[in-house]
Amino acid sequence: MADLSCNVGGIKSPNPFWLASAPPTDKLYNVERAFRAGWGGVVWKTLGIDPPIVNVSSRYGAVHYNGQRMMGFNNVELITDRPLEVNLQEIKQVKKDWPDRAVVVSLMVPCNEKDWKYIINKIVDTGCDGVELNFGCPHGMSERGMGAAVGQVPEYVEMVTRWVKESTDLPCLVKLTPNVTDIRKVAHAAKAGGGDGVALINTVNSIVSVDLDQMAPEPTIDGKGSHGGYCGPAVKPIALHMVTEISKDPETQNLPISAIGGISNWRDAAEFIAMGASGVQVCTAAMHYGFKIVDDMIDGLNNWMDEKGYATLED
């Protein structure tokens, strides 16, 4: 049987399948269910500074294609709407109970040194394995000068990453937005700032459909709608291309990559790993089919690696 253990920028896990920062990783109950199902790691739902934001409902939409609603998934979800201290306590408990699993904390705060160093100092005592800097969210938070508003400016990416690395020895993954002209420039900036790896892609800025009765983008809330983040199987080709661009670029070819975007089965994961990823993150498929899909992912990747004669993911 192949060895599926992985190391993404100094963050180790028993297999390469992590749950991405999203509703499935927003609380202790969900994360414990995920670990019992077999996931190798989680990226905790993005934390910010209190007071918490308010998430609206409904906040999800989908692309209709040949009778299938899940070709693409759209959301206007923001960061966590739970108090910071509650999240910190639960992260500490999860890591205590599951020491062999990767627990990475996603972070997003206003783009100033004081707030970034404040949030880093708050999470270091949780025992988490690393942090993921959310520079990718294209909606809601970007209008507040966070998320993709930072990730679209390489100078900001380098600056904030450096602030974080000056404040902690924890491994730091920089989550990149696909809503840029050249993903390589942003990856260069993440590396220059001291980032230990990159995670990509975050969601694609989108409007998936329009409610022709209310004349507003879907999903609508009280008759109003907005652009959101597009994910799911439809974005996989975009993600594969951007992962490949970074892994083959001479300046970043050895930079660890946590690949995200439309990964629904072991074959998708194998494709990203073949193109240079050290591990993968899953969200939409887990929301659609449930946490136990990781069983087939682990078995499928194991069987394929055995068949091809690969002993480790590095092979």
Can you annotate each of these PLM segments?
Residues 311-315:
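Mid-to-C-terminal alpha-helical segments outside catalytic/metal-binding sites
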